[in-house]
Design a protein with these regions (language model features):
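Short, structured surface patches at the beginning of a domain
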Residues: 1-108
Length: 108
């Protein structure tokens, strides 16, 4: 499956969080036979409107350049339970899967 990785930090105290997430998700994708075709990285926490890479990802959904988006946790993709249904609907309409490879506590 062709996948994109979406990486976002949870707070300003990042350290190597972005690099770690990218390595972790790329490794998982490769181990499961997925081809990583794009990586979207939002380097600052913030509201969805400020997540420019997420907005770029959403704009590419209908282009079908990837079949799934791998994220560390649903709380990386959406800022709250209220935001998630709208995002999930966009992914579903485009036929793109949201893939969360690890059992996470997706506290928003």
């Amino acid at each position: 499956m062709r996948v994109a990785l979406y990486i976002r930090i949870a707070n300003d105290n990042t350290g190597d969080a972005i690099s770690y997430q990218a390595q972790e998700l790329r490794r998982w994708s490769n181990e499961h036979g997925h081809e990583v075709v794009e990586v979207f990285k939002d380097n600052a926490p913030g509201v969805l409107a400020e997540c420019f890479e997420l907005q770029r990802l959403l704009a590419q959904l209908d282009a079908h350049t990837f079949d799934g988006v791998v994220v560390r946790g649903l709380n990386r993709l959406a800022r709250s339970y209220y935001d998630f249904p709208q995002l999930a609907d966009k992914f579903q309409k485009a036929g793109v899967k949201i893939i969360v490879p690890y059992d996470t506590d997706d506290a928003f």
